[in-house]
């Protein structure tokens, strides 16, 4: 799902009540803060725009209903801004508030709420794998209910979730999302498709990281064959093909390292067993020497 900032200026002035001077003053402050936020954000300055996003959100609380679309959009913008500024923990906290507002405004089965859950998952990805996975899964479930679990929308959001989780080293969790996406792409497009190749590459990379050489070989080979058959000249296809070939070329290296590691473990196990045997033998009590029998008493 492509993310776009939610613009508010087109309806702000029409929706704000300016009946009283105090409200007019707050409205002016709000619009100034939001314009500053939007301008700095468009210039790619999330850190500088952050204070204005927070000011706009705070001022809006006295101008709009707490469960209005405007408050939902402002909360979403602020949470995204925090994430862009590298403040993941604060972003995750704000997204939990955004989820509550979106649920009230749009309902529990809306595409909009799915987007919020997805970004909440992104914010938590490097902080808490369990919370991140839960948010992704909730968003994915909504998309599945709306478009169907065999739809390309469902495949796309699973692919995106898998990529984000794998980037944060949550590889085992990411594998499940990749496999869902792969099944749909293969059924829809076959092997010779960029999306199918992309998922095969990520699954090959996952098993490469876990030194599962034969499984990684299978997925990377599928990705390479699929990409070569496309004869794509675009940057994405070429970059993916180079990366897949690079990993594939290192599989023998990974196998050698893994085999040496396993041999070292075996040697260590043998040494530990030898030491344990020696310790058991040295701790056994020595046999008592023969004791002289007492002579019989004379009668």
Q: How would you name each of these model-derived features?
A:
Residues 1-299:
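Intrinsic-disorder-linked linear interaction elements in eukaryotic regulatory proteins
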